[in-house]
C-alpha cells in the first residue's frame, strides 16, 4: 500500500489523532500500584525481579525471545487448599491442582490485559501447561517459575524441590508475568529457608526420589508422578500401537489404567503422587498443628499416603524399583520404559544427570571417553565414582573405556539396546577397553 494511501486509512487517521504517550504510565512503574493490581486480580503474594538479576541469568535469552525487550518479571503465588492436597484421594488433590492452576493463569491474563490497555507490553506464560512441546524432550517451558519466585522473595526451595512460601508453605502454585517496563522497587530473596529439614517428604515419597542427604532422583519422580503426562503418555501410546489385538492390549494395560488415561485426556493430566507437597509442615500458616502434635500429623497425613495400596511406575533396574520393594510392600510396581529419551547428543549430555541411578553405581569407579561423529560431532568425558556422576566437555584424564560412535546409531542404541551387537559388527560403535564397562555404564542409566 502506498504511503499516502496508508495515511488516509481511517484506522491510521484515528491513531495519529490519539496521543499514545498519554496511555502509558511513567516509568518506572510504581511497585506498590503494580503489586496491588496483582493482588486485586487474585494473587496471594507478589514480587518483582529485574531482567538483569544474576539469579535468572540462565533464563535471560529465552525470556527475551518470548518478549523482546523484557525488563521486569512479576512473580506471584496462588494459595492452594491444604487438605485437598493432603488427602489420599488423588482425584481431590488433582482437582485442587487444576483449579488453582486455572486461577493462576487467569490472574496472569487479567494483569496482562490491564497493562496492555496502558500500552505496557506484557505476556503471561502458563503456570504449567501448555508448553512448547515441539522442543520436548529438551526445555519446553517458557519461564522457570521457581528460580524467579525465589529471586522475588516469595520463598526458598525445600529439600523436595518445591518452593516453600514463608507464610503459605509449599501449598502454592507459581505464576510469572513478563513486562517491558522497569519497576520502582524490586524485591529480594528472603534471608532464611522455611524448609524445616524434617525429612517427611523423604519418608512419604513412594519412589525414593528424595534422599535424606538432599540428592534428587529426577527420573524416579518423573516416571511415576508424571505417568499421564508427556513421555509417560508416549509410552502408553506405544503400548497401544504394539498390541496385536484387544486381548493383547489388556494384558499390557489394566482396565483401571485405561480409564485413568481417559480421565487425564478428558479432564486434565493427573499427578500420581505429589506426596512430598502433601506432608510438608513448613510455613507460618501451616506449621501450628505439626508443632502441637507431630504424632497426629504422622497418623493423619503421612501414614495414609504411605499405606495406600497403589501401582508405582518404575523403570526396570532403577533405584525406584528397589526402593518400592524395600520400603512399601503394600504398593505394586509396574515396569515402564524410560520416557526421557534423547533425540540429540546435546540432549543426551543434558539428560545424563537426570536419569543417573546412583545406587546402581555404588561399586563403580570408571572414566569413559565418548567421541560422537556424523550428524553431531562432540567429545565428552563421563566419570562415575562414589555414586557420583560427572560429565565434562572434551576428553580429560586416562579413560577406562573409549567409545566412538556414529551419532544416529548411538541414539538408536539407547532406544533399543539389543542392536548393540549389530552396531559393533558394522563398526558404527567402536570400543577400546572392556565391554563389561559399557554394560556397567548402561546399568546406571536403565531404559
Mark where each language-model region is:
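Non-catalytic, usually N-terminal nucleic-acid engagement modules in DNA/RNA processing proteins
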Residues: 1-104
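Long, highly charged amphipathic alpha-helices
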Residues: 33, 106-110, 114, 351, ...
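Catalytic cores of enzyme domains
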Residues: 57, 99-284, 288-300
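Short glycine/proline-enriched loop/turn "hinge" motifs that connect secondary-structure elements
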Residues: 64-69, 164-171, 395
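Residues that flank catalytic or metal-binding motifs in active/ligand-binding sites
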Residues: 70, 173, 276, 366, ...
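Conserved hydrophobic/aromatic beta-strand scaffold that supports enzyme active sites
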Residues: 73-75, 176, 279, 381
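Short small-residue beta-strand/loop micro-motif enriched in glycine and branched aliphatics
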Residues: 83, 184-188, 390-393
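Feature captures hydrophobic
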Residues: 300-447
Amino acid at each position: 500500500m502506498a504511503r499516502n494511501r496508508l495515511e488516509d486509512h481511517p484506522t491510521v487517521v484515528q491513531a495519529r489523532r490519539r496521543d499514545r504517550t498519554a496511555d502509558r504510565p511513567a516509568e518506572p512503574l510504581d511497585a506498590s500500584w503494580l503489586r496491588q493490581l496483582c493482588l486485586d486480580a487474585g494473587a496471594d503474594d507478589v514480587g518483582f525481579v529485574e531482567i538483569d538479576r544474576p539469579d535468572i541469568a540462565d533464563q535471560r535469552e529465552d525470556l527475551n525471545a518470548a518478549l523482546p525487550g523484557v525488563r521486569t518479571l512479576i512473580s506471584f503465588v496462588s494459595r492452594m487448599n491444604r487438605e485437598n492436597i493432603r488427602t489420599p484421594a488423588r482425584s481431590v488433590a488433582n482437582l485442587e491442582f487444576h483449579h488453582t492452576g486455572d486461577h493462576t493463569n487467569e490472574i496472569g491474563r487479567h494483569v496482562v490485559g490491564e497493562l496492555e490497555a496502558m500500552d505496557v507490553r506484557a505476556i503471561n506464560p502458563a503456570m504449567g501447561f501448555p508448553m512448547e512441546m515441539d522442543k520436548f524432550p529438551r526445555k519446553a517451558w517458557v519461564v522457570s517459575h521457581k528460580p524467579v519466585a525465589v529471586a522475588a522473595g516469595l520463598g526458598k526451595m525445600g529439600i523436595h524441590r518445591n518452593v516453600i512460601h514463608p507464610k503459605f508453605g509449599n501449598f502454592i502454585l507459581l505464576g510469572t508475568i513478563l513486562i517491558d517496563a522497569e519497576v520502582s522497587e524490586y524485591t529480594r530473596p528472603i534471608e532464611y529457608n522455611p524448609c524445616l529439614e524434617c525429612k517427611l517428604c523423604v519418608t512419604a515419597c513412594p519412589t525414593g526420589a528424595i534422599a535424606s542427604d538432599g540428592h534428587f532422583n529426577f527420573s524416579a519422580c518423573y516416571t511415576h508422578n508424571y505417568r499421564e503426562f508427556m513421555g509417560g503418555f508416549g509410552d502408553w501410546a506405544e503400548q497401544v500401537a504394539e498390541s496385536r489385538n484387544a486381548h493383547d492390549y489388556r494384558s499390557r494395560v489394566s482396565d483401571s489404567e485405561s480409564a485413568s488415561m481417559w480421565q487425564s485426556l478428558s479432564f486434565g493430566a493427573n499427578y500420581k503422587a505429589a506426596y512430598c507437597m502433601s506432608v510438608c509442615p513448613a510455613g507460618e500458616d501451616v506449621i501450628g498443628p505439626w508443632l502441637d502434635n507431630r504424632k497426629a500429623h504422622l497418623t493423619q497425613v503421612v501414614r495414609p499416603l504411605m499405606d495406600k495400596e497403589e501401582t508405582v511406575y518404575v523403570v526396570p533396574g532403577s533405584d525406584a524399583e528397589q526402593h518400592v520393594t524395600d520400603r512399601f510392600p503394600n504398593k505394586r510396581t509396574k515396569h515402564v520404559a524410560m520416557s526421557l529419551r534423547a533425540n540429540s547428543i546435546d540432549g543426551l549430555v543434558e539428560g545424563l544427570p537426570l536419569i543417573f541411578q546412583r545406587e546402581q553405581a555404588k561399586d563403580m569407579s570408571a572414566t569413559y571417553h565418548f567421541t560422537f561423529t556424523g550428524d553431531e560431532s562432540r567429545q565428552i568425558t563421563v566419570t562415575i565414582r562414589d555414586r557420583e556422576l560427572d560429565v565434562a566437555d572434551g576428553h580429560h584424564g586416562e579413560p577406562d573405556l573409549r567409545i566412538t560412535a556414529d551419532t544416529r546409531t548411538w541414539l538408536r542404541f539407547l532406544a533399543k539396546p539389543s542392536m548393540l551387537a549389530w552396531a559393533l559388527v558394522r563398526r558404527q560403535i567402536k570400543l577400546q577397553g572392556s565391554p563389561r564397562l559399557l554394560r556397567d555404564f548402561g546399568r546406571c542409566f536403565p531404559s
